[in-house]
From Swiss-Prot:
InterPro entries from the UniProt entry: Spg4
Family membership noted in the UniProt record: Belongs to the SPG4 family.
Chain spans, region Disordered: 71-94
Species annotation: Kluyveromyces lactis (strain ATCC 8585 / CBS 2359 / DSM 70799 / NBRC 1267 / NRRL Y-1140 / WM37) (Yeast)
Name of the protein: Stationary phase protein 4
Known role: Stationary phase-essential protein not required for growth on nonfermentable carbon sources.
Disulphide bridges, residue numbers: none
Length: 127
């Protein structure tokens, strides 16, 4: 009798399977031949140790690339190492509503070089 009600379930992997076949865990759709999808219930965030390792690796890569320099802070008693980001790597907050068109285009081209080629229409609507 319980097999009869299985046909009315919304999601049942074994709905159309033979009686002796049972799938145990996993997803039959993610076989590796196609794109594998991760659903929210399957996601497990990184542990604290993994986060620290990733942050240390990112800092080491930034130091190696020259984006960050490590300096000793004279204000602390133990003079621990702290990172100070160089001036060009720091994001700058700009109020674009107060910029002229030329200043905005110069700033935009500095941030996104090569986005618009010379003579290419920008497809913007002027109000």
């Amino acid at each position: 009798m319980s097999r009869f009600f299985d046909a009315f379930e919304v999601y049942n992997k074994n709905k159309h399977a033979p009686a002796d076949f049972k799938s145990h865990g996993g997803s039959s759709l993610n076989t590796g031949a196609t794109t594998a999808y991760m659903f929210a219930r399957e996601y497990r965030g990184p542990s604290t140790g993994e986060k620290k390792e990733a942050a240390a690796a990112a800092l080491a890569a930034d130091v190696k690339a020259g984006k960050v320099e490590l300096v000793n802070d004279p204000n602390t008693a133990d003079s621990s190492r702290k990172s100070s980001v160089s001036e060009e790597a720091m994001p700058q907050m700009v109020d674009i509503s107060k910029l002229t068109r030329e200043e905005f285009e110069a700033l935009y081209n500095k941030i996104n070089p090569g986005m618009l080629r010379k003579g290419e229409p920008n497809n913007k609507v002027n109000f």
